[in-house]
Structures are given as structure tokens and as C-alpha cells.
């Protein structure tokens, strides 16, 4: 029977992580469990930085961005001996289960603890990239989307004033959800998504045609890692003549107070994670699909499941611009 659980956040931070921690802590306490916080992710676990949490430990955190537990990337966790020590540390505290909030790398860590040591782990999807399989939305995505749209709105004001072409680089790694949705909401004229490839010549020709038809400014939304946006800006300006500037939104997308959607999603998922542990589940990851909370085998989710590309959204965008 589970009596003690721990919670950690790992990888890149995302708005709503604090709400998820709060939900795990308070749901666990309401069920009579002891709840512990692991500081700075798997690195903190390896360094035995674990602290018992109370109801008041998570007061006034639901509206705060980031994660008060801290987060860190810890590549050493790939080493079997490091994972073994982490499992020993959890057992030394009498901890029976672990809730991991993070992205795919965090899930992999939870998967290995479950596979190798039989340690009950539940994964919650916390990343602005919305690239975790088994869920329609990840914690932090909606807030990051609002941040990106706000930036696009501001860039449109100044781009229109100066007849400028603006390139906006948006996070997401190999998933274009954030880029496509921000572009639709922000009225961007062009979208460059990694799933469909990038043809620079085709993009420039489209811009040239738009300018020839009377367009005086434009905004291009592009997912990070597709190309060097500053070089692209120079290439476009050299061809079309209009001043062209690239803006990399970067880590500003990870910050800020989480929106209501992310607070509610994180709260629901956190409570659900505790319920799953009490039901005897382990090695599961939580998601939301068609507005219903679901759970999947964490190993299957990482190895087999794939997130669908929003091709229908991209087709919508083509008819709007």
C-alpha cells in the first residue's frame, strides 16, 4: 500500500507546473499520504535533495510561472548506476511512488525507473512544445501560445508602420503546433513547419507575388531549428528589397503566469495522477483526449505512439492568408 509519494519537475520549465505540483501535494494529503518534493529534477534526486511538503508548501503557487521545485537537465541519468542510486535514495526515504512532470526526456527517466527497478512512476506532460504523445494538450502549451500571439500582435504593429517583413521564430522543436496555432491566431501570412519541409525559394517567390499585388508588410511564423532565421531575413531582404528582421521569441515563451486553461489542466492531471497511484497503477502517463483524462503505458507512449500533425490546421491557414 502506498503511503509516501514524491513529485519532481524535469527538463524545460512550463507555465502550470506549479499548479500540477500543488494538485499532487494537496490530493495526496487529502488521501492521507505523505508527499515529498524533489528539488531540481533528477539531478536533485541523485543529490538527495528531497523535502517533505505540507499543504502550505504549495500556497500561492498556482498563479506563478516556472516551478518552485526547480528543474534541471541531467544527462548523467542515462547511466544505469546513476539510476540505481536514485532508486536507492527514494527507498531510503520510504517513498513508494513518484510523479514526474516534464517532457519526453523526463518520461524516459520515469520509464527507466519503472522498467529497471519496478518503481511506480506516473508522468504528467509538462512542456510548452505540445509534443508529448497520448495527450491533446500539454501543461504550459496554451500559455505559451498566448505569449506567442501577443508577440506577433506587437510585431504586426511595428511591421505595418515600417512596411517591414518580420520573421518570428517560435519554440516547439520538431512539433509545429505552437507555430501553426500562433500563426492562425496572429494572422501571419506565411507558416514554415518542420513536418512539411522548408523550401526557401518557394517562400521568397510567394512574398514577391504578395508585394507585387500590393501587400506592404508580412509576418512569417517559423518553428525553431528549421533554418537560421537571421540569414533567412538577409536573403529575403536582398531579393525583395523590403527591410526584413527576425525575432527569436526564445525562452520568453516559457515564462509568465499560467493561463486559466493550464491551471485547470494541471490541477486535473495532478489529482488524477494520485488517483492512479492509489489504484495500483505504475509506469503510466497522463493525458487529456477529447476533454477526458486518460492514461497510457509510459513505455508504449515513448516507443510507439506518435503525435498527429495538425495538417488540417495548416490547410485552414492557407485559406486565410
Swiss-Prot record:
Binding site for Mg(2+): 104
Keyword Cell inner membrane: no
GO biological process: canonical glycolysis; fructose 1,6-bisphosphate metabolic process; fructose 6-phosphate metabolic process
Highest taxon of source: Bacteria
Pathway entry: Carbohydrate degradation; glycolysis; D-glyceraldehyde 3-phosphate and glycerone phosphate from D-glucose: step 3/4
Active site: 129 (proton acceptor)
Keywords: Allosteric enzyme, ATP-binding, Cytoplasm, Glycolysis, Kinase, Magnesium, Metal-binding, Nucleotide-binding, Transferase
Protein name per Swiss-Prot or TrEMBL: ATP-dependent 6-phosphofructokinase
Organism in which the protein naturally occurs: Actinobacillus succinogenes (strain ATCC 55618 / DSM 22257 / CCUG 43843 / 130Z)
Primary gene name: pfkA
